[in-house]
């Protein structure tokens, strides 16, 4: 057998430097490196259908192949000594020096050769570790051969440690390395940002949701839903004064009402039974199950095993920083699906709260994000969405129908309805959804899916490995032989011959060889296997079940096989003693990972299903039952689980003899104490007798169904097939002798067995002696009535070693006798405990504890809220402050802020002086509000210039037409600041709210690029509503909104004013910029539009904002003039246009703290208000003069235009004449060339005629010579001529002959 292609055995250059240590200690070069000396046993690539129970056998195969490379013709190399180097993030397998000596640890052998390594891969790509309980020194791990390719196979690498205690250390070190690497991978990357920007986002208004009966929507669905919503709104307004409104904390589905309607109100009704499917996709074949997950996870999951993977992908990073909230409506009790005559379930939204959402269409899902609560309120994968629709009357509304599962096994269709700002926006949303669905479908269809059905050969191997897991080798051998009997004679003979050739020396080795050849056979048969429901209708009857003639007959065969296996497999699994000690005799997967991998399993049988689940399987189940089986039906037998299950509270059905429901068992609770005591004594006698005659006393279990008698053929079957080995029986006898002295074990066994002696009606049955085989049969006959606690409470030995028959936990209703007989108190004491006073005190205590818990929860929520607020404030103010603020200044500011609350005017000189000394970063937002209040106390805007009186919350409830421009600029605003860097995080959503509210408030300005930076600076220092008030102050009171108007007239005036300032105060710099054609609009426009926030550091921008709130718009001119004057020398040194622009945009903003403080000081000392006013008047005067001169000079301008047009035409005429002359010269040259060619042609023709005449003469001469020569000479002559023609060099040789 060739080594697996996924394992690299060739030498590669090793990136590590040589280090002297090879132990698990950090090397001197890299402190984080760890090294382990191990033996590399080998590796192999796995089939996609390989499951967990198969892995120990695969590991044993690799181990055996390395120990006996000649067995079976396998050419695998023997184990080699290696050094496993853990160097973040890589795991490298390096050949160990001195590997020829097994375990040599000489000083020379401690130096690894860094030139080569066997293989390397990243630690985070390792998906699972495998222990071998048969030999604790062996372990393995699984990894994808090509991690970047989702379709690549898994590879298994097996190692052997010198000491079993070394294995946990190695695995723990690899896991720590993997966790560290995964944290690095989890950081935002460029791909995540591209995924965010590639996703389309729209602002929508959530209208409500309606429960529908079909997954396809009629054209009038949206209009019908809107009519129902309006009807509910009218009813709500009527009772608004009488009834309290719904909780404003909910996000979706606030109030559920039942609105009567006609059948056409919603969708075409369907019968009651047609809606009870399992939520499988339309068109999916029920018998064939499509695996929606890869058999092995992509990453190491510390606390989980086979976690359910997303069908399409991991979640897009578009909502990375959003706190994901669970939909509150899903926590409520969902309404039952209605009958055809039942009314529709309508859940409109609450109009009194903010219902605007961000509708994000990603690559594989739809997210509905609430900017108000900063959370994802709805997330739906494309696979759950069945259709989308747009309104006919309400053209600005749309909706989609999706599948929801309120509880496992129950699915319903919900229609969510939304409103957009315009019809064109709805068209864009619908087009985006259509394109996204098409792209996702194309990607999904290109993905290779692993299909499994009940008849798959690999599935039968999986079931066999599950059944023999944890069994002793002799018992496993019996199970394997029974499985081999289902194969054809040729296949059995072939496997038998191959195994005998290898001469196994033990049952364990023989089992490994049989599983090896059986796996090879199953893989070969799987290639030609046709899944159920995929094969043609007419197939030969001689084939195996997967090629059966009809699906009905095949189903019957499956049920017959299940009935045949139900007795045997349960008996074999009952004999598997010692769950924690014996399940690894043949090698098992890490128990910790496996117990966690099935912790969420509730009512699904892993033993009767393929390992894959359909896409619509409930996420809480690790395995899905066969679709045609009822997991609660009596004939559905639950496998004896080999995993550790937590208690579960799922319901079960009991197969009672008289066919009554579960409530029939209630008479068991009303048995008289005398009958119970007599039953208990009879059971104890039976227990003693059975102990003396049975070799399996530990198998007594509780049984709540009536006793059954084993048929004779089953008795003979179990006597022949269920015989134990002598060693095993001796162990059981020893265990029996040891447990006979255990009083607690006797008590539990008698209490459980007493339940067997009672019938369903409550009458006692006379106990009789039964054999241990009959007891096993009684347990197997109806295992659904079995509870794990009853079996675990038999005795101390069984509780620790035997495995549960069911993962379900007992209840008081199911096991009353166990609860009754397990205590040692008398009935009088039990009655005393139930006295009313004690019960009342217990209730009082419970109520007080609950009240205390609620208070503690509220306090914890307050503490968490305050902690989150402090953390958010810390993140917001994460910038370096310019200029230190002294304690005295801080105290003075505190006093000023007290006056702010009283709205008292303060002396502006004092404020100017105090502001010059500094502003504390933590109180900056309050100080800005204080400065705004002082300005408004002195200056009052006229009524015409004041902003509309609309509250911030009311604005947020509306839709804005500027949503696209705002959403695009969210990622561009302070992209490096932690508060705004998270895509659609709290910072970006708050910024979206603020910009949206202002765009709705100021219809003239709307939204303009640059406002986002101003709003971002405000949000860093105050809340949303406070920032909105301050943004209105800046725009309306201070007049900044003029520069954002669509005509940009104010910005042109500002550019003229800045140019005049440079011309008057820095003439050399002005001339230098004019010579290089650099106008102020090239470098100063961002300064004015973003108030320096887009290019300069936040500390400097905050100080600029301090002065702006005090002095207004002229601060921008002061700062710009100070910046240019301070760097005048360096600007003058730049000689070209590109160098000057590069300096102004990149070098100038990169200042140190001292330069910033110097500029701020100059700004405080500068006063240019008069100059700015004069320049503005000058601009308007010049503008008026130009307009007047334009009217007076219209005629002269017309004449000048005509003269210019005439001169242009003359120039064009001259150009055409020159082109014409050039064309004439070209024509003449071409004509002369043509004449020359014609003369050459005539000469050539004459020469050809002459040569033809000569040729004819030569031919005549040759004919005459042929007639004169004899025939032999002619032949020799022809040969000679032929040789001469073939080899022209021979002419020279012939000519040289004498």
Swiss-Prot record:
Stretches with biased composition (Low complexity): 672-682
Effect seen on changing residue 588 to A: 80% reduction of insulin-stimulated GLUT4 translocation
Effect recorded for residue 972 to K: Loss of Rab GTPase activation. Only 20% reduction of GLUT4 translocation; even
Ranges where the record places region Disordered: 1-31, 241-287, 317-353, 586-685, 725-765
Effect caused by changing residue 751 to A: 80% reduction of insulin-stimulated GLUT4 translocation
Major localization listed first in the record, in broad terms: cytoplasm
Domain PID per the UniProt entry, residue ranges: 53-209, 312-468
CDD domains: PTB, PTB_TBC1D1_like
Residues with the Omega-N-methylarginine modification: 577
Pfam families, per database record: DUF3350, PID, RabGAP-TBC
InterPro entries named in the record: DUF3350, PH-like_dom_sf, PTB/PI_dom, Rab-GAP-TBC_dom, Rab-GAP_TBC_sf, Rab_GAP_TBC_domain
Connected disease: Type 2 diabetes mellitus 5: A multifactorial disorder of glucose homeostasis caused by a lack of sensitivity to insulin. Affected individuals usually have an obese body habitus and manifestations of a metabolic syndrome characterized by diabetes, insulin resistance, hypertension and hypertriglyceridemia. The disease results in long-term complications that affect the eyes, kidneys, nerves, and blood vessels.
Protein name: TBC1 domain family member 4
Annotated source species: Homo sapiens (Human)
């Amino acid at each position: 057998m060739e080594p697996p292609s996924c394992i690299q055995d060739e030498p590669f250059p090793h990136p590590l430097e040589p280090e002297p240590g090879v132990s698990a200690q950090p090397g001197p070069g890299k402190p984080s490196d760890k090294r382990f000396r191990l033996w590399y046993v080998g590796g192999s690539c796995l089939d996609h259908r390989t499951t967990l129970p198969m892995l120990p056998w695969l590991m044993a195969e690799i181990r055996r192949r390395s120990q006996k490379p000649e067995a079976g013709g396998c050419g695998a190399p023997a184990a080699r000594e290696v050094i496993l180097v853990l160097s973040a993030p890589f795991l490298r397998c390096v050949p160990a020096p001195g590997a020829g000596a097994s375990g040599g640890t000489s000083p020379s052998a401690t130096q690894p050769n860094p030139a080569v390594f066997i293989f390397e891969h990243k630690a985070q790509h390792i998906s699972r570790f495998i222990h071998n309980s048969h030999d604790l020194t062996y372990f393995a791990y699984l990894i994808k051969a090509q991690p970047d390719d989702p379709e690549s196979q898994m590879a298994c690498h097996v190692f052997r440690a010198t000491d079993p205690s070394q294995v946990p250390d190695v695995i723990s070190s690899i896991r720590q390395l993997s966790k560290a690497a995964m944290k690095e991978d989890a950081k935002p990357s460029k791909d995540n940002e591209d995924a965010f920007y590639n996703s389309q986002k729209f602002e929508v208004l959530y209208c409500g949701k309606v429960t529908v009966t079909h997954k396809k929507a009629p054209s009038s669905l949206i209009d019908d839903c809107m009519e129902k919503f309006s009807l509910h709104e009218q009813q709500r307004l009527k009772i608004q004064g009488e009834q309290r409104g719904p909780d404003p904390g909910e996000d979706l589905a606030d109030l559920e009402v039942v609105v009567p309607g006609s059948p056409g109100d919603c969708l075409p009704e369907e019968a009651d039974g047609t809606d009870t499917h399992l939520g499988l996709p339309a068109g999916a074949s029920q018998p064939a199950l499509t695996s929606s997950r890869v058999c092995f996870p992509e990453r190491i999951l510390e606390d989980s095993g086979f976690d359910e993977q997303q069908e399409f992908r991991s979640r897009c990073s578009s909502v990375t920083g959003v706190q994901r909230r669970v939909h509150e409506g899903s926590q409520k009790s969902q309404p039952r699906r209605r009958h055809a005559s039942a009314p529709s379930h309508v859940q409109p939204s609450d109009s009194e709260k903010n219902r605007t959402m961000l509708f994000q269409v990603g690559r594989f899902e739809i997210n509905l994000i609430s900017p108000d609560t900063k959370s994802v309120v709805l997330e739906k994968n494309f696979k759950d969405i069945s259709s989308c629709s747009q309104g006919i009357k309400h053209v600005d509304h749309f909706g989609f129908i999706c599948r929801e599962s309120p509880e496992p096994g129950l699915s319903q269709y919900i229609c969510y309805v939304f409103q957009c700002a315009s019809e064109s926006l709805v068209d864009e949303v619908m087009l985006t959804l259509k394109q996204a669905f098409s792209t996702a479908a194309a990607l999904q269809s290109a993905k290779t899916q692993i299909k499994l059905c009940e008849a798959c050969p690999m599935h039968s191997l999986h079931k066999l490995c599950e059944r023999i897991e944890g069994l002793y080798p002799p018992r496993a051998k019996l199970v394997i032989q029974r499985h081999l009997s289902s194969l054809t004679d040729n296949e059995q003979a072939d496997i038998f011959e191959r195994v005998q050739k290898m001469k196994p020396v033990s049952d364990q080795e023989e089992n490994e060889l049989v599983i090896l050849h059986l796996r090879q056979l199953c893989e070969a048969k799987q290639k030609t296997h046709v899944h159920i429901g995929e094969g043609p209708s007419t197939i030969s009857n001689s084939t195996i079940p997967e090629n059966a003639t009809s699906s009905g007959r095949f189903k019957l065969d499956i049920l017959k096989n299940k009935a045949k296996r139900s007795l045997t497999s349960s008996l074999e699994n009952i004999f598997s003693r010692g769950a924690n000690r014996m399940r690894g005799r043949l090698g098992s997967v890490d128990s910790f990972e496996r117990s966690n991998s099935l912790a969420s399993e509730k009512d699904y049988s892993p033993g009767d299903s393929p390992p894959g689940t359909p896409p619509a399987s409930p996420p809480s189940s690790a395995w899905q039952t066969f679709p045609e089986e009822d997991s609660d039906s009596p004939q559905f037998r639950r496998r004896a689980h080999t995993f550790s299950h937590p208690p579960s509270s799922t319901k079960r059905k009991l197969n009672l003899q008289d066919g009554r429901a579960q409530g029939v068992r209630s008479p068991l609770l009303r048995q008289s104490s005398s009958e119970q005591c007599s039953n208990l004594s009879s059971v104890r006698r039976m227990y003693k007798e059975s102990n003396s005659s049975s070799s399996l006393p530990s198998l007594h279990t509780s049984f709540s169904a009536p006793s059954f008698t084993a048929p004779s053929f089953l008795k003979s079957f179990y006597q022949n097939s269920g015989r134990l080995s002598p060693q095993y029986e001796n162990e059981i006898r020893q265990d029996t002798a040891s447990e006979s002295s255990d009083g607690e074990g006797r008590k539990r066994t008698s209490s459980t067995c007493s339940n067997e002696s009672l019938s369903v009606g409550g009458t006692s049955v006379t106990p009789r002696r039964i054999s241990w085989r009959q007891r096993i049969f009684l347990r197997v006959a109806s295992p659904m009535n079995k509870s794990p606690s009853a079996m675990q409470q038999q005795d101390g030995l069984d509780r620790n070693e035997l495995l549960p028959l069911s993962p379900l936990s007992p209840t008081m209703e199911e096991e009353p006798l166990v609860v009754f007989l397990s205590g040692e108190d008398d009935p009088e004491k039990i009655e005393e405990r139930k006295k009313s006073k004690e019960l009342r005190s217990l209730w009082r205590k419970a109520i007080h504890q609950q009240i205390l818990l609620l208070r503690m929860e509220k306090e914890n929520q307050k503490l968490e809220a305050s902690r989150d607020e402090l953390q958010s404030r810390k993140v917001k103010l994460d910038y370096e402050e310019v200029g230190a603020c002294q304690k005295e200044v801080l105290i003075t500011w505190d006093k000023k802020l007290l006056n702010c609350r009283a709205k008292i005017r303060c002396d502006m000189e004092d404020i100017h002086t105090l502001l010059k000394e500094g502003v504390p970063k933590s109180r900056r937002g309050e100080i800005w509000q204080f400065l705004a209040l002082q300005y408004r106390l002195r200056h009052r805007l006229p009524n015409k210039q004041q902003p509309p009186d609309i509250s911030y919350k009311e604005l947020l409830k509306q839709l804005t037409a500027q949503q696209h421009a705002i959403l695009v600029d969210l990622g561009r605003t302070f992209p490096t600041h932690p508060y705004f860097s998270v895509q659609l995080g709290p910072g970006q959503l708050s910024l979206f709210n603020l910009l949206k509210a202002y765009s709705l408030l100021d219809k003239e300005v709307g939204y303009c690029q640059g406002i986002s930076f101003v709003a971002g600076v405000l949000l860093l220092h105050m809340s949303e509503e406070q920032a909105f008030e301050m943004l209105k102050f800046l725009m309306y009171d201070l007049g900044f909104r003029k520069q954002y108007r669509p005509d940009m007239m104010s910005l042109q005036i500002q550019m003229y004013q800045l140019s005049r300032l440079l011309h008057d105060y820095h003439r050399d710099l002005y001339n230098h910029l004019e010579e290089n054609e650099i106008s102020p609009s090239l470098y100063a426009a961002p300064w004015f539009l973003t108030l320096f926030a887009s290019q300069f550091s936040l500390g400097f921008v905050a100080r600029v904002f301090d002065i702006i709130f005090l002095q207004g718009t002229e601060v921008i001119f002061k700062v710009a003039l100070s910046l240019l004057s301070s760097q005048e020398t360096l600007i003058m040194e730049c000689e070209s246009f590109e160098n000057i622009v590069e300096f102004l945009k990149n070098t100038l903003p990169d200042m140190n703290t001292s330069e910033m403080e110097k500029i701020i000081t100059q700004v405080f000392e500068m006063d240019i208000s008069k100059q700015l006013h004069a320049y503005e008047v000058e601009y308007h005067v010049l503008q008026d003069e130009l307009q007047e001169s334009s009217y007076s000079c219209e005629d002269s301008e017309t004449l000048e235009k005509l003269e210019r047009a005439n001169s242009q035409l003359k120039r064009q005429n001259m150009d055409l004449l020159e082109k014409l002359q050039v064309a004439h010269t070209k024509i003449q040259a071409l004509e002369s060339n043509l004449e020359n060619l014609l003369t050459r042609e005539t000469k050539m023709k004459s020469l050809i005629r002459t040569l033809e005449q000569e040729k004819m003469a030569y031919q005549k001469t040759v004919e005459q010579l042929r007639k004169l020569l004899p025939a032999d000479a002619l032949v020799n002559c022809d040969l000679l001529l032929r040789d001469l023609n073939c080899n022209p060099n021979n002419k020279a040789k012939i000519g040289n002959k004498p």
